[in-house]
UniProtKB/Swiss-Prot annotation:
Keywords from the UniProt entry: Autophagy, Isopeptide bond, Membrane, Protein transport, Transport, Ubl conjugation
Protein name: Autophagy-related protein 5
Gene null: resulting phenotype: Blocks autophagy and displays increased sensitivity to nutrient limitation, with decreased conidial germination, growth and sporulation. Leads only to a modest decrease in virulence.
PANTHER family noted in UniProt: AUTOPHAGY PROTEIN 5
Species of the source: Beauveria bassiana (strain ARSEF 2860) (White muscardine disease fungus)
Gene designation per UniProt: ATG5
Cell location: Preautophagosomal structure membrane
Protein family (similarity comment): Belongs to the ATG5 family.
Glycyl lysine isopeptide (Lys-Gly) (interchain with G-Cter in ATG12) crosslink site(s): K102
Modification note: Conjugated to ATG12; which is essential for autophagy. Conjugation with ATG12 involves ATG7 as an E1-like activating enzyme and ATG10 as an E2-like conjugating enzyme.
GO annotations of cellular component type: Atg12-Atg5-Atg16 complex; autophagosome; mitochondria-associated endoplasmic reticulum membrane contact site; phagophore; phagophore assembly site membrane
Amino acid sequence: MSAPISQALWDARIPLLITHPLAPTTPFITSIPRFSYLALLLPRLSAFFNTPCSSFHFEDVVLRNLPVGLLVDLYQPSLPWRLIVNDGVSWDISDTFLNAAKEADFIRNGNANQIMKLSKDDTRQLWHAVIDNDLAAFSRINNRLLNAPTALKHVPMRIYLPLAPGGSAGGDVGEPTVDQQQGGGDASAAGAFKIIQSLVQPLGADRRPRLLGQVLRETMPKLFPSSRDPVMANVLLHGVAVPFNAPLADLMREAAYFDGWLSFVVVVL
């Protein structure tokens, strides 16, 4: 990662105002890095509200264990982000992170050898760097994952497509999808979205770097009829629109989330 870009991403924070149904007038006010998980707040919230807390709700949506910045890009809340915490479905957040990082490693290399070769202590340090929002400690381990001895095979890239009520995304976009949806698999549920994923090579047949706009047009041609400019939709990454002429391999190194994924959110214009 370029130091100024990566430091800016790790420094960015989201202000939160969190309440519990048992104490609606006593909010827990804090901020959290965009490069973090809401679930890391649960021990503090359980102590603050003096009751078990394991799930977060925004309006009528039960939030998944995605990076905070990705959730903000998906739901576009006003700030401070007003959340409700309660007892409900919970996940082991360290497993969530490690599984996502393994998937990204497999996509990059065709195997997960790089991350599987990490020692137990290295894996622990990688996770604790996320917990501590420690870019320097994270980079010491993550650079070994990004600099494999073999050439990059594919770019770990997912496109999150918010769905309107009824499961529509503004028409049939004809995209390959991963079988994951917010809302318990119910595409008509509040806050539902599709995750679109395909194998994206870093170089084209002409050996030139693949650009974001090219891949968007190939993947979702009805939403992205132009590979040069946003016409019907744009994509957000870390809260900002991404230039369509950005090389994907460079984006991966400069702006992937801590789990190794480029996670774009579609915004229909």
